[in-house]
Swiss-Prot record:
Protein name: ATP-dependent protease ATPase subunit HslU
Predominant localisation class: cytoplasm
A single cellular component GO annotation: HslUV protease complex
Record's subcellular location: Cytoplasm
Keyword entries, A-Z: ATP-binding, Chaperone, Cytoplasm, Nucleotide-binding
Annotated family: Belongs to the ClpX chaperone family. HslU subfamily.
InterPro entries, per database record: AAA+_ATPase (IPR003593), ATP-dep_Clp_protease_ClpX (IPR050052), ATPase_AAA_core (IPR003959), Clp_ATPase_C (IPR019489), HslU (IPR004491), P-loop_NTPase (IPR027417)
Any GO molecular function: ATP binding
Purpose of the protein: ATPase subunit of a proteasome-like degradation complex; this subunit has chaperone activity. The binding of ATP and its subsequent hydrolysis by HslU are essential for unfolding of protein substrates subsequently hydrolyzed by HslV. HslU recognizes the N-terminal part of its protein substrates and unfolds these before they are guided to HslV for hydrolysis.
Cited Pfam families: AAA (PF00004), AAA_2 (PF07724)
Quaternary structure and partners: A double ring-shaped homohexamer of HslV is capped on each side by a ring-shaped HslU homohexamer. The assembly of the HslU/HslV complex is dependent on binding of ATP.
Gene Ontology terms: biological process: protein unfolding; proteolysis involved in protein catabolic process
UniProt cross-references to SUPFAM superfamilies, sorted A to Z: P-loop containing nucleoside triphosphate hydrolases (SSF52540)
């Protein structure tokens, strides 16, 4: 779990996301409160439930990006889901309980990965011994044939040294390794996910103990054996307990596109993927127990962050019970020309930097002038204003069009060349297209 302060979290998010201070502060406080809660005594800790967040803002302003970056910062079980993928219980489609099952699976992977790294040193020693067991008997057979009386321990140490130095990396050996269980996909009706998981585990166990002899180079065999030995050192029961605890106490669920499950005022009849889904989400957000293949998971202290554009609906169109379970509301602002300008230059691995790095592989050096950047930002903003506002995603469309010729002809140059993207270059390639609204609708 992350021990970063709210200020440090916001600073880290600032490296990748421009603006949206309120949203960054809200998620930073929520993340820090997880850490604060764990410092309390057990009785009080149980009483403090997370304050779930609802992020409201137009498309392309950074809602999903905040979730992506938060996942890396949290160092806790995290899952991002689309609200539109779920249907009401009893209908064909994914049930909301699968969110917690997927979150638990991700926690298992995360903790298993940490355990493997922790055991890597010991696993490497065991893998080394297994490879030496294959190499040394061959030497012993040769000793018998030649009737020489060399010290076997000294020979073993020589081979150990060679193995560690990498001089034997390309030598081929035969090793006995476990067969990877074959994944079996089972289609099951809604509500039968638990049975499906049990059947999949059963089929995997049938092949799980099988072993196979493989002929591999020592460097490849070492990697395979380290993984196998590290997995053997893990206590699976302890791993499951740790994963369930991590999900229950530190788990974060990000529900995107929640505005798409608001009731459509113009329609009649059952709304199996709208209001029904909202009602199914209620117990999950409020706190219930979900059955997973790893054990029972309580959702009382899982943090839920929902987001939506709410262009054709408002948060008040959500059912009142769900509104009450998302008490913190954060409104994200539409992006301005200045924001676009900063997005093109400020973030780590910005879009312009990506193009420069890609074309550098073809010996094409791209220089963006301040005026050129400003004109690109203005072009993207104008297209957003005259048509659908898709936020920062418009920059990708505009830049792709601007860089099309350069990208196509980049491999034609034998020597290194430099191309400057200034205001004139941008005007030449974009202005006519932007002024022709019919064309820009299809191209930009």
């Amino acid at each position: 779990m992350s021990e970063m302060t709210p200020r440090e979290i916001v600073k880290e998010l600032d490296r990748f996301i421009i603006g949206q201070k309120k949203a960054k502060r809200a998620v930073a406080i929520a993340l820090r409160n997880r850490w604060r809660r764990m410092k309390l005594n057990k009785e009080l800790r149980y009483e403090i439930t997370p304050k779930n967040i609802l992020m409201i803002g137009p498309t392309g302003v950074g809602k999903t990006e905040i979730a992506r970056r938060l996942a890396k910062l949290a160092k806790a079980p995290f899952i991002k889901v689309e609200a539109t993928k779920f249907t009401e219980i009893g209908y064909v489609g994914k049930e909301v309980d699968s969110i917690i099952r997927d979150l638990t699976d991700s926690a298992i992977k995360m903790i298993k990965s940490t355990a493997i790294k922790k055991n890597k040193k010991r696993a490497k020693e065991l893998a080394e011994e297994r490879i030496l067991d294959v190499l040394v008997p061959t030497i012993k057979n040769n000793w018998k044939k030649t009737n020489t009386n060399n010290n076997s321990e000294a020979t073993l140490q020589i081979f150990r040294k060679k193995l560690r130095e990498g001089t034997l990396d390309d030598k081929e050996i035969e090793i006995n390794v476990a067969v990877t269980p074959m994944g079996i996909e089972i289609m099951a009706p809604p509500g039968m996910e638990e049975l499906t998981n049990q059947l999949q585990s059963l089929f995997q166990n049938l092949t799980g103990n099988k072993r196979n002899i493989k002929k591999l180079k020592i460097k490849d065999a070492m990697k395979l054996l380290i993984e196998e030995e590290a997995a053997k050192l893990i206590n699976l029961e302890e791993l499951k307990k740790e994963a369930i605890y991590a999900v229950e106490q530190h788990g974060i669920v990000f529900i995107d596109e929640i505005d798409k499950i608001c009731r459509n005022h113009g329609s009649s009849g059952p709304d199996i993927s709208r209001e029904g889904v909202q009602r199914d989400l209620l117990p999950l957000i409020e706190g219930c127990t979900v059955s997973t293949k790893h054990g029972m998971v309580k959702t009382d202290h899982i943090l839920f962050i929902a987001s939506g554009a709410f262009q054709v609906s408002t948060p008040s169109d959500l059912i009142p019970e769900l509104q009450g379970r998302l008490p913190i509301r954060v409104e994200l602002q539409a992006l301005t020309i200045n924001d676009f300008e900063l997005i093109l230059t400020e973030p780590k691995a910005s879009v312009t930097m990506q193009y420069q790095a890609l074309l550098k592989t073809e010996k094409v050096k791209i220089n963006f002038t301040k005026e050129g950047i400003r004109h690109i930002a203005e072009a993207a903003w104008k297209v957003n204003e005259s048509m659908e506002n898709i936020g920062a995603r418009r920059l990708h469309t505009v830049l792709e069009r601007l860089m099309e010729d350069i990208s196509f002809h980049a491999s034609d140059h034998r020597n290194e060349i430099t191309i400057t993207i200034d205001e004139k270059y941008v005007q030449k390639h974009l202005d006519k297209l932007i002024s022709n609204e019919d064309l820009s609708r299809f191209i930009l």
